[in-house]
């Protein structure tokens, strides 16, 4: 097409544009536009000349060649992501800006809008508002009559706070501040305001610090939040998926042709980055109504609102964190040599166990006797199962046991101790995984002994953790007699194995509901 064979020449381009569009032409005629395109192509390959038609300068000796449309080395023009309605009907090359340059020269700037595309088959179930084009940096939403009003906005900062998100007319507006409320924020809150930091937040994308605010917002520090905007934090209108500023990523940089794919990819990255935080259960606690009732004089700030003063007491806390400074959740388990300290670190605030794995290398001094474990397993199988099942188990064990024997044949005592330390160190990491996993899980050695178990497995089977790990005697393996398995027990052999009573269908449903409630707690 001729639109693709245009040459980036400012003189020829201006002449072609003036010849292409006239002021008196109002109808969009496809045939007429094709004639104009042919005339434009002829004019671009025509050499420069004076008024008499004589060639002048370097163009007299060399003429511009006409490029072959199939030539891969021909200069190409950057295509727009979506043409406007006028350029789409005329089959002309459009631009990303709105209004485009062709509509501006024709006087159709007010009517310049994106053309309608045919939906793909996989997008038939997508809503129409999710298929809007990605708004580029050159997108101009305001028409010419509103530009004069925006120029006078810096003198009155409060009048420019109505609609903060620059979205098309179809999207809802997001009023975040009351138009008639102004005030000067005290210095302590300016320095410790969490949703004014440089870190992106999925809940407060439009808050800025004093240094990086627009020109129309320099006079406003923290106005009182209106009731409508306060309800938007907990309502569904604020979390509009068509609003790109909600997720704090650049949709233009993702190079997607519509919001449907860009938002999905951006939200996946948003979740992967860990910036998605748990919203507060009570929206009124996250954003109090009496923000504007702060002390703006020489009196100390937050005299009448102690809970609000505690919100911004820590810079490291996430947005809308309302816990007091000493209300960190304690660690679930602390196995460090030194006792629990009075000041908890960031890891304890997140509920992670503050253990020291170096204790493994100090406590493990003997290798684990897998030979004794295999003999105990064989004796238990012969006593518990029938001869046919025992033979099948023995064949299965015989296929894997020679591999372990050949691996440990050349190892000395230090190697076996090192192997046990590696096992305990790996088990140290597995226990953290099992603590955060809701699936009933247990870790066994290759000889069958249980090395670790999580809480969900004990709830499922009815066995306590001490019995499963062999710390307390039972009637299965650790009977309380002398041996390696009962070395850590109390020595009493009167403990009985717990028996699960048979239950009917109603009791099973009740038990499943109770176990689900326990897991949720």
Swiss-Prot record:
Comp. bias (Polar residues): 275-287
Pfam families xrefs: PAS_13 (PF24990)
GO biological process: cellular response to starvation; gluconeogenesis
GO cellular component: nucleus
Annotated Low complexity bias: 297-308, 337-351, 480-494
GO molecular function: DNA-binding transcription factor activity; DNA-binding transcription factor activity, RNA polymerase II-specific; RNA polymerase II transcription regulatory region sequence-specific DNA binding; zinc ion binding
Matching InterPro entries: ERT1_acuK_gluconeogen_tf, PAS_13, Zn2-C6_fun-type_DNA-bd_sf, Zn2Cys6_DnaBD
PAS domain residues: 426-497
Subcellular location: Nucleus
DNA-binding residues (ranges): 84-112
Alphabetically ordered keywords of this record: Activator, DNA-binding, Gluconeogenesis, Metal-binding, Nucleus, Transcription, Transcription regulation, Zinc
Tree of life domain: Eukaryota
Basic and acidic residues compositional bias, start-end: 21-49, 65-74
Compositionally skewed regions (Acidic residues) per UniProt: 1-12
Keyword Transcription regulation belongs to the record: yes
CDD domains on file: GAL4
Residue span of region Disordered: 1-75, 273-308, 322-358, 478-501
The family this protein is said to belong to: Belongs to the ERT1/acuK family.
Functional description taken from the UniProt entry: Transcription factor which regulates nonfermentable carbon utilization. Activator of gluconeogenetic genes.
Name by which UniProt lists this protein: Transcription activator of gluconeogenesis SS1G_02293
Species this chain originates from: Sclerotinia sclerotiorum (strain ATCC 18683 / 1980 / Ss-1) (White mold)
Lineage of the species this protein comes from: Eukaryota, Fungi, Dikarya, Ascomycota, Pezizomycotina
